[in-house]
A protein has these predicted regions:
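N-terminal leader/targeting and accessory segments in enzymes
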Residues: 1-88, 262, 267, 291, ...
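Phosphate-binding loop of NTP-binding sites
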Residues: 7-10, 86-232, 236-247, 363-364
Length: 482
């Protein structure tokens, strides 16, 4: 592709490059540079890509996009923001695949993954759609499963994936859109047919620093969608909508008055939730096989999205009744022959842990037992908060390790326990997560619900940059054999 075509719609501050030069590839990692490629130098959180311009040149790069003229003897294009430039370049390189797809973006602290799976399920069953999915657990092209490394891929990988999806015949794409992705322009250049806001609670403050900045990051999505679907029960929706530029807003909720889609007569069961959904003159009874109060919100935003795309509520409800849940989201781990229940859930944030515990308290016949830890090298302020939530809502707490990463596991546990000091809730601290799970099973009583919180779909534990195999389903199954 000609350099001039790659740079279309990109404001250029300065260049000495031949705009008619043929470019063979695009990269932003100098180690991937090759003969005739365009290297985009990005100033990242840990390193500055401008340092690697000489290496890219040595590897054959024909031109570099950067934020200041390089010292190395190489044709260059200077732009104001090379990260945003990468997004524009990616759109051009892959010929704007998002324009060929009905794009649906879901943002919020919790509920993104479940919502995307529910939307995919409804559209495939009731709209005759082939749906691409991009998210935390995995990426999917229809039923084909692809590996994923982060909630929202970098802009170049994202556009490449969207091109794959379009070429494979996908009509719709539903994707989780993280606050990082919005701030770091990973989704820049994409227009969403529907943008969804699930909720906002403490998370990623190591990146955003304040809740207001975190909310404003989420709000970017509502500048880039045709319909903005939002949770009217979440108090942050007011700030989120202050400057929203989307032409149509659509609200959902359980408690808020005047919502466009409302859940009534909510019933919580051990293996499901049920409620009546109302929008305009339409009504439908809904049952979903994910046992939690917050499932109602995830279901409402999925129904709101699909209703705005032309699927009647009754059709949404019929599709949802056939859905059997999402891996690592209130997932029941089989315990044949035992009179206790083990749930696996990805709740690694304060509000998610609180929601899970409140939901389980609503149907547990025995004790509510929670086993959890907090991730290392992440927001430390939420650790005592989560400890306090666990102590307040659970009958017994087992504090253990999540992904310690480069931190000392005991230090993380001590941070969590700081939030439990003034409570009389019994607890035990066991740094080894496998031992902790065995302890929970050994001490289970009849009717107990044991929540293994934090890992969810993950089948590994990260310690000192190494991913060690750890699948809680396998741990439970193996222990039951002995």
């Amino acid at each position: 592709m000609k350099l001039i075509d790659i740079l279309k719609d990109l404001p250029v501050l300065e260049t000495n490059a031949d705009l008619n030069a043929d470019i063979t590839d695009v990269c932003y990692d100098s180690r991937q540079a090759g003969e005739g490629c365009l290297f985009v130098a990005i100033a990242g959180a840990e390193t500055d890509g401008h340092k690697y311009i000489p290496m890219a040149r040595e590897r054959g790069a024909a031109c570099v996009v950067c934020q200041h003229a390089p010292d190395a003897a190489i044709p260059y294009v200077v732009v104001e923001d090379s990260r945003r430039a990468l997004a524009v370049i990616a759109c051009n390189w892959f010929d704007h695949p998002s324009r060929e797809l009905t794009m649906i973006g879901v943002t919020g602290t919790s509920g993104k993954t479940t919502s995307t799976y529910l939307i995919k399920s409804i559209l495939e069953q009731k709209a005759g759609a082939k749906v691409g999915l991009i998210g935390t657990i995995q990426n999917m092209i229809g039923s084909e499963v692809l590996h994923t490394e982060r909630t929202t891929p970098e802009s170049f990988e994202l556009q490449k994936l969207l091109r794959q999806m379009s070429d494979a015949g996908c009509t719709h794409v539903v994707m989780e859109v993280s606050s990082h992705a919005l701030v770091l322009d990973r989704v820049y250049g994409i227009r969403f047919a529907v943008g969804i806001f699930t909720n906002l609670s403490q998370d990623h403050l190591d990146f955003h620093h304040t809740m207001e900045a975190y909310c404003d990051a989420k709000a970017i999505l509502f500048d880039r969608c045709d319909v903005g679907v939002y949770n009217a029960d979440d108090p942050w929706h007011t700030r989120l909508l202050q400057n929203a530029k989307c032409p149509r807003l659509f609200s959902y909720g359980i408690h808020a008055a005047g919502t466009d889609l409302k859940a009534k007569s909510v019933q919580l069961h051990p293996g499901s939730v049920a409620f009546d959904a109302e929008a305009d003159t339409e009504w439908a009874h809904v049952r979903v096989g994910i046992p939690a109060q917050f499932t109602v919100y995830n279901t409402l935003d999925a129904m709101a999205c699909c209703w705005n795309l032309g699927v009647p509520l009754t059709e949404c409800a019929d599709a949802l009744a056939r859905n059997h849940g999402v891996k690592g989201r209130m997932e029941i781990i089989p315990t044949p022959g035992k009179d206790y229940t083990i749930l696996n859930d990805y709740s690694h944030k304060p509000d998610a842990l609180e929601n899970v515990l409140e939901s389980v308290n609503g149907f547990a016949k025995g004790r509510t037992v929670v086993l959890f830890g907090c991730g290392g090298d992440r927001d430390k302020t939420k650790r005592p908060v989560m400890g306090g939530i666990a102590a307040r809502l659970a009958d017994f707490v087992i504090v253990t390790s999540d992904n310690p990463r480069t931190e000392d596991p005991q230090s993380i546990i001590d941070d969590i326990l700081a939030g439990m000091r003034d409570t009389d809730t019994p607890y035990v601290a066991i740094p080894d997560r496998v031992e902790a799970i065995h302890y929970a099973m050994d001490h289970a009583q009849g009717g107990d619900v044991i929540i293994l919180a934090g890992k969810g779909h993950e089948d590994y534990q990260e310690i000192d940059h190494v991913h060690y195999p750890m699948d809680e389903r396998v741990i439970v199954a193996d222990y039951l054999k002995h």
